[in-house]
Amino acid sequence: MSALRDEALATLRAWRPPSARQAALRREYVDHLAAHPDGTERSCPGAHVTAGALILSADRASVLLTLHAKARRWFHMGGHLEPQDGSLAAAALREATEESGVAGLALDPEPLHLDAHDVAFCGEHPSVRHLDVRFLARAPEGAVHAVSEESIDVRWWPVGDLPDDAAELREMVDAALARAQTPSTSDATSDPTAASSSRAI
């Protein structure tokens, strides 16, 4: 997935972090990808890049979260990159669609938020650091969701009343609300092929 690694590097280098903490995480991600040609693959030991999306309701009042079957906690939609993913944005849109069951998601191709965390249930490795790149996905009016095999439950949560075990999502939700209120210079897309050719600015 060297082409995907190159795309991820280009996207992260072009992204303007909104805070010093996010800038430090971007440096960590870029350094990791520069040092590891397989840094986007789940087989990369120690750490690898993942992608996901926070799904915002059409009225911007709720976010769609999944109760992860292994972690038993509420998360945004996301997961590992796959060889067919043409970009980080395409991977995020694929994961969001697969895990939520929502058709017609519109994904902003510019990264929204970064978060690095250790995961104890990632395949054959006892502990792996996930370098997660999160995007904003907007659900259409009347969106219908479903529970995937990776989840116990999928549910809409008011943006002001997140689950108790998802307090760390607050920063990302706030970033999503701010992004949703600002006219975007990038075109949102519900087409993974289009997302793979979109460039963050």
Name each model feature, range by range.
Residues M1-E28, S100:
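Predominantly extracellular/luminal regions of secreted and cell-surface proteins
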Residues R16-G52:
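Acidic, metal-coordinating catalytic segment for phosphate/diphosphate chemistry
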Residues A61-V102, G160:
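Conserved Nudix-box catalytic region and its N-terminal flanking loop in Nudix hydrolases
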Residues G101-A143:
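Active-site segment of metal-dependent pyrophosphate-handling enzymes
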Residues R134, H145-A176:
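NUDIX/MutT-family hydrolases
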Residues T182-I201:
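Intrinsically disordered, low-complexity terminal tails and inter-domain linkers enriched
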